[in-house]
């Protein structure tokens, strides 16, 4: 879940 948020931040 956290990795997903970081991915969209990129």
From Swiss-Prot:
Q: Which domain of life is it from?
A: Eukaryota
Reported tissue expression: Nacreous layer of shell.
From the Swiss-Prot or TrEMBL record, give the protein name. Answer: Uncharacterized protein SMPP12
């Amino acid at each position: 879940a956290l990795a997903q948020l970081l991915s969209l931040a990129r």
